[in-house]
């Protein structure tokens, strides 16, 4: 791994640990609805520390027209940070349960209101989907990668049925998002940051 990549990893991990810990502390003092702006700034700073730049093309529908299901292609470890920096509203997410066990990151996900899903246990997966339904009932939007996992090739994987079932069942609009360049920056199977 080139020296510059090692430097970027060290810088981004230290930045994440500091800002993640600060975010968790501040999240105890302010209501979750006000965390979105802080999260956007923190994610952008971590991405900058990793040598990444985020540029938004296009626009989102007004939050007042929601709730929405924001769906994005998942090709990189950086995707979640990228998406948070551009989303116009506080949005919950659904993610594999293993993410919630990662120190600091798992705590941030829980505080953010993310919902863990265990795809290996049907009853738990159904309960997670029911929790998403309650989010929609409360007017909250959802962020999800319909592929269910990161692509190892940079190409789209087949979509899972769950996100579309949620959209139809709850009559929620789908907002597609395309992330470009993240696969080239840090893809699954490589630890090199570019």
Provide a role label for each language-model segment.
Residues 3-28:
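A hydrophobic membrane-anchoring feature enriched in long, contiguous, low-charge segments
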Residues 44-54:
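Membrane-cytosol interface motif
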Residues 67-69, 141-145:
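Residue-level preference for the first positions of well-ordered beta-strands
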């Amino acid at each position: 791994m080139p020296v510059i990549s090692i430097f970027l990893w060290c810088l981004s991990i230290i930045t994440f640990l500091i800002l993640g810990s600060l975010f968790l502390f501040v999240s105890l003092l302010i209501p979750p609805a006000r965390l979105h702006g802080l999260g956007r700034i923190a994610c952008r700073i971590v991405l900058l520390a990793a040598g990444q730049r985020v540029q938004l093309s296009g626009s989102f529908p007004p939050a007042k027209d929601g709730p929405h299901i924001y769906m994005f292609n998942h090709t990189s470890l950086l995707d979640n940070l990228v998406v948070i920096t551009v989303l116009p509203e506080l949005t919950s997410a659904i993610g594999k349960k293993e993410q919630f066990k990662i120190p600091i990151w798992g705590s941030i996900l829980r505080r953010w209101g993310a919902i863990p899903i265990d795809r290996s246990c049907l009853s738990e997966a159904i309960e997670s989907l029911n929790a998403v339904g309650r989010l929609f009932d409360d007017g909250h939007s959802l962020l999800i990668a319909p592929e269910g996992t990161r692509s190892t090739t940079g190409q789209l994987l087949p979509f899972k049925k769950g996100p579309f079932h949620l959209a139809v069942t709850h009559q929620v609009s789908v907002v597609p998002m395309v992330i470009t360049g993240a696969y080239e920056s840090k893809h699954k199977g490589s630890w090199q940051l570019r």
